[in-house]
């Protein structure tokens, strides 16, 4: 069995973020939480994670901008957008930056765990192919 994924939650809603952190910690997932895009980018410069749970609508730097800068910095984490709503233009834009999944808030813990597991498996498979010299 593979190791449990590491997850970064980027969400400006303190209560929602705290609940998610607790729900994932109970399942033995290494989880980190930050409240803004700037903190997320700083965190990702110093720490690798498998999955980023990213809110799109945040004050200051939007989730779209966070995602764009993550990719520019070379972050290879799988990204799951967690948001109350996303407009079509925004959805197209985030897909261009490699969003792997999308969940509406509030989300069911089991569904979130399933999505995190799938994202972790995709990342592990992708990294395994690179290690073996395949693309």
Where are these regions (language model features)?
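Receiver (REC) domain active-site loop signature in two-component systems and cognate sites
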Residues: 58
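Two-component/phosphorelay signaling modules centered on CheY-like receiver
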Residues: 14-32
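C-terminal output helix
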Residues: 107-117
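Active-site beta3 strand of CheY-like receiver
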Residues: 47-53
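Acidic catalytic/metal-coordinating carboxylates
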Residues: 35-39, 62-65
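Short amphipathic alpha-helix used as the core "switch/output" element in two-component signaling
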Residues: 42, 64-75
């Amino acid at each position: 069995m593979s190791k449990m994924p590491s997850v970064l939650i980027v969400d400006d809603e303190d209560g929602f973020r705290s609940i998610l952190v607790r729900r994932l910690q109970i399942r033995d997932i290494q989880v980190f939480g930050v409240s803004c895009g700037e903190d997320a980018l700083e965190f990702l410069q110093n720490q690798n994670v498998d999955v980023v749970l990213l809110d799109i609508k945040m004050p200051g730097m939007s989730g779209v901008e966070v995602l764009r800068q993550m990719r520019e910095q070379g972050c290879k984490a799988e990204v799951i957008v967690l948001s109350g709503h996303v407009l079509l233009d925004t959805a197209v834009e985030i897909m261009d930056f490699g969003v792997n999944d999308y969940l509406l808030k509030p989300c069911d813990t089991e569904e979130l765990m399933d999505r995190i597991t799938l994202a972790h498996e995709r990342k592990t498979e992708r990294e395994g192919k690179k290690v073996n010299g395949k693309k």
